[in-house]
Amino acid sequence: MTRTAKLLLVPILLLQILFFIFMALHRFIDGDEGFYLLASKLVLMHKKPYLDFLYEQAPLLPYVYALWMKYFGISWNSARIFSALLTTLLGTLLYEHVCRQTRNWLAGLAAAVLFASSTLVFAWFPVVKVYSLAELFLFAAYVAISRLSSTSPRWLMGASGLLLGLSVDTASYLLLLIPVFLWWIFRNSDAGARRPSILWFLGGFTIAMVPCLYLFISSPDAFVFSNVGYQAIRTNAGLMGMWSEKFIVVLMLFIGGPPGNGIQNSILFFIALGFIFSIRRPRYPPRFAFQIAVIVAVISLLPTPAQQQRLCLCVPFLVVSAVCVVNDLFVTLESRRQRLLAAAACVCLLGIYLAGSANDLRKYLITGDGIPGVRWAHDKDDWRLRRVLEVSQAIDRVASPGEMVASFWSGYIFQTKAVPSLGFEADYGLAIAEKLTLQQRVRYHVLSPAEVESNFAAHVPRIVVVGNQYSLGDRMRYTAETSLRAHGYTLVRSIGDTSIYVYYSKP
């Protein structure tokens, strides 16, 4: 890195911290954040994913967030600030890598701006989901392996394997990237160093897989169901179906749609695609970054249903490939006129890119239009952090410390003194319950609607919270509230579109 690049490192770090923490504290809540946070709280209570509660992802995230919350508080603000810090670390690593690759601080600055202003980044990384943690590990693995040379230490490949393994521990579908990394090592290592480099890489990856291996050995069936089986049955199309939907998601990625604009993704992708293969330099990391971006996009689209938000994992790699290739082509221009025209074109594209995110910022911070889950809500303020905390405080007023509460959305229980009723640890279990046998439901910690009805009839638990069950729909809400009233539960508080029911035993 040049001296100027090093001087800019701290300001870029601080500006990202301010921006991403602002986004984390003011963005509408995503529905999945509830069960990720509750899973992290359960880990703090010495419970294990798969073995003690339903958890439909690789297991690392709840452990990492639990460790953070152990020291910085069990709260929405604490967890979201942690996500913002992870995103900041990712953006800073991106800046450092581009500066090192191009030896140009201006290219690094452009990369940081493109990263932070991408809708897919500011909308999905600073929230409590797998994206920021998995991407930080994945991008760090890429940075480590991109520095492979005849003089690089062997442990660097071990570190890359370890980091890739940690990303797989967070989002299991990234396992499919292993062949891509192995191919890069094979193609770019000296003949005598290929085998040791690959072994070091695989050794690091194996070490990272130890937690997953432990949980798999403890309950192979529950582990496989949570990471693969759930995705296969959550829709009627199977694990990798609904191809027309995937095509629409790809189309919206480039032309725009309700979740965000398409111009930013089009600029990054087509600039990289148009020029990346014109640079014949061997061991060219930006080309590897582009390959990772494309393969991650394909992998992310495979599970059903396809979700555009998963493609946020491609953005840092597209930024690297686009910025580096433009910089490398720019330095080959000989005349001053050519350089001025190229610089003007870059400034123009940057302006268009930044303008593309203006309306999306308004969506995710103010209106909620087009945001998954929020746009269908009867009261969009139910997905504001202040409203969720208001409901949690109301629960604490009627529940004793440690009392079990059934909430149809996990997020309401997280920042309370209560604990989730058995089977309500994950709010999406009810949606798939009728596709499972009784034995499977017991093994995976899932309740069926009939079992929920039976529990309400027995007045178990005493407190039930109905609201924000976006994955279940209005019909489930109507059924639940009808059952609660029929079995003597009393509505004690309504906050927005959320209701708290309590059963008071008769003397």
Language model features with spans:
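Membrane-lumen/periplasm interface segments of specific transmembrane helices
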Residues: 19, 198-239, 302, 352-360
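Extracytoplasmic
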Residues: 57, 174, 350-506
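Membrane-interface transmembrane helices that cradle and orient dolichyl/undecaprenyl
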Residues: 99-102, 139-159, 186-191, 269-285, ...
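Membrane-interface alpha helices of multi-pass inner-membrane proteins
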Residues: 111-112, 155-172, 178-181, 206-207, ...
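Hydrophobic/aromatic-rich transmembrane helices and adjacent perimembrane loops
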Residues: 131-134, 176, 297-337
